[in-house]
């Protein structure tokens, strides 16, 4: 796939198990980086579900436009931020990189720092695995249960196996994050799962890093 010399960082949010908060995390991270940290970015939504990034933005837009008072408040809010809302593009996984690079080429003055990709809920097809290899970094949330861990390790192994068969790949790290942790669950269980994942990934992949999102 085509890459440009001044390409920004490509950050993907991916998960093999639905309902772990992938899209929610992607939206939170995008908003914090853009509105609070002044990171110039746009989002490519590859998730075609009803709760996708793009469809959520469309629903929010319709809600604001239908209420004059809310519309006025939002204009004042963005004026105070001195920023407009970040752009969200919708794309099929197979065309996501091409569409992102095309948008970057058409807006050279924007000088984007980051492009965030919200992957579909299940990244098991060859197109989605290929898209994974085109990322610089992937954030993959997981829950402290066996099903989530097995799905996560299977995904990592698939990305690694495909990557080593290619002459060059872009991916640098897959960062695993504990999410939706039940605070009633003992720390020892999370620590055990963390050690287990680190041991398993040592044998199947060399670019995986595990971090703990929620400290109990």
Predicted feature descriptions by range:
Residues 180-216:
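Beta-strand-loop-alpha "switch" segments that mediate conformational coupling across diverse proteins
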Residues 110, 126-146:
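Inter-motif core of Ras-like GTPase G domains
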Residues 108-127:
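Glycine-rich phosphate-binding loop used to anchor ATP phosphates in small-molecule kinases
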Residues 2-8:
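Phosphate-binding P-loop
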Residues 30, 34-35, 132:
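Gly/Ala-rich phosphate-binding loop of Rossmann-like dinucleotide-binding domains
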Residues 4, 14-20, 35-114:
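P-loop/Walker-type NTP enzyme "switch/lid" segment
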Residues 152-168:
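Conserved C-terminal guanine-recognition region of P-loop GTPase G domains, centered on the G4
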Residues 24-25, 29:
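Hydrophobic positions on the alpha1 helix immediately C-terminal to the Walker A/P-loop
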């Amino acid at each position: 796939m085509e890459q440009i010399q001044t390409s920004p960082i490509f950050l993907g949010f991916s998960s093999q198990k639905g309902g772990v908060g992938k899209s929610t995390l992607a939206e939170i991270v995008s908003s914090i980086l853009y509105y609070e940290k002044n990171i110039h970015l746009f989002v490519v939504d590859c998730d075609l579900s009803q709760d996708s990034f793009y469809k959520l933005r469309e629903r929010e837009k319709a809600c604001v436009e239908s209420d004059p008072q809310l519309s006025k408040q939002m204009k004042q809010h963005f004026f105070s931020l001195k920023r407009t809302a970040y752009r969200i593009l919708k794309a099929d996984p197979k065309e996501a990189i091409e569409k992102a690079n095309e948008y970057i080429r058409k807006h050279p003055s924007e000088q984007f720092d980051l492009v965030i990709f919200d992957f579909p809920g299940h990244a098991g097809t060859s197109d989605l695995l290929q898209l994974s290899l085109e990322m610089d970094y992937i954030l993959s949330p997981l829950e402290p249960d066996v099903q989530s861990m097995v799905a996560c390790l299977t995904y990592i192994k698939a990305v690694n196996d495909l990557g080593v068969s290619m002459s060059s790949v872009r991916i640098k790290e897959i960062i695993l994050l504990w999410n939706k942790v039940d605070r009633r669950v003992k720390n020892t269980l999370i620590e055990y799962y963390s050690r287990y994942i680190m041991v398993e990934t040592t044998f199947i992949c060399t670019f995986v890093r595990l971090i703990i999102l929620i400290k109990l």
